[in-house]
């Protein structure tokens, strides 16, 4: 008996929708990263993109535990001298709540070509509306 190696024809991708209302950021991110990488599938193969699509709605209603909501700082670098930009969690939550959830989930995926391919199947939206109703996404329950 030989080892099973799936081909690209064997992959059937599903769509899942996650409601972030009242969910803890890290717990939601780990579950979403697991589905995006395909580790929830019995046919998981590490060298192939086996993951499903994930839609996260209500990104503005995500929560953090402890004092992280006051202490957490998001940094980015422009590439110029003195170009380190810092923004607090509360400010970024008001301005771009989708960015918070995206960064948390992408940080849990591999930093390779395959990881970027997995991250492209992530869709995060502010509010409870999303344009993917035609794909008939199934709800993904996260106990957070």
From Swiss-Prot:
Keyword Ribosomal protein belongs to the record: yes
One GO MF term: mRNA binding
InterPro entries: Ribosomal_uL13 (IPR005822), Ribosomal_uL13_bac-type (IPR005823), Ribosomal_uL13_CS (IPR023563), Ribosomal_uL13_sf (IPR036899)
Keywords: Ribonucleoprotein, Ribosomal protein
One GO biological process term: negative regulation of translation
CDD domains referenced in this protein's UniProt entry, alphabetically: Ribosomal_L13
One GO CC term on file: cytosolic large ribosomal subunit
Coiled coil: none
Domain of life of the source: Bacteria
Position of the signal peptide: none
Family matches, as PANTHER family: LARGE RIBOSOMAL SUBUNIT PROTEIN UL13M, RIBOSOMAL PROTEIN L13
HAMAP family attached to this UniProt entry: Ribosomal_uL13
Annotated function: This protein is one of the early assembly proteins of the 50S ribosomal subunit, although it is not seen to bind rRNA by itself. It is important during the early stages of 50S assembly.
Subunit structure: Part of the 50S ribosomal subunit.
Assigned protein family: Belongs to the universal ribosomal protein uL13 family.
Name of this chain's protein: Large ribosomal subunit protein uL13
